[in-house]
Amino acid sequence: MLGEKHVGSSLENLNDFNADFQNFISRFAWGEVWSRPGMPRHTRSLVTIAMLLALGREDELRMHLRACFNNGVTKDDLKELILHCSLYAGLPAANAAMHMAEEVFANLGIAPQKLSEQQLSQEQMNQE
């Protein structure tokens, strides 16, 4: 779900204080809930991102924005999800998520392309 890089990082950060908690997360969240039949991982990713956006859980949101591509989520899926969440979670939360998504895209080498002059003109006309 989160990819081998995240798993490796989690294992490297285990210590005598957090090991039981990390084990619980691995067994319950990933082993039980995320592995259940009945809802595709693509959908689980989108639902999770929407909830984290609404709750303002930025660290977890960044992690799931990176990981969602492992579950078949696309940039267009995220764009529509964030736009939709702006109605129910508020514009500030959605705006923060939009910026986080753009940062994640840049880190993954899939940064959005700038609009052409023609596209910019069309956008301006649409706003008038």
Stretch-by-stretch model annotation:
Residues A54, Y88-L91:
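Alpha-helical transition-metal enzyme core signature, strongest for iron centers
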Residues R44-L52, L81-I82:
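Short, structured motif recognition centered on aromatic/hydrophobic residues
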Residues A54-K79:
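Mid-chain, well-packed structural core segment of small domains
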Residues A50-M51, H64, C85, A101:
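Buried hydrophobic packing segments
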Residues M1-H42, N70, A96-E128:
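Acidic, glycine/proline-rich low-complexity segments that act as flexible tails and inter-domain linkers
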Residues A19-D20, L52-G56:
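A short, ordered amphipathic alpha-helix with a cationic face
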Residues H84, L91-N95:
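Substrate/cofactor-recognition hotspot
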Residues P37-S45, R57, K75-K79, P92:
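Short, low-complexity cationic-aromatic patches
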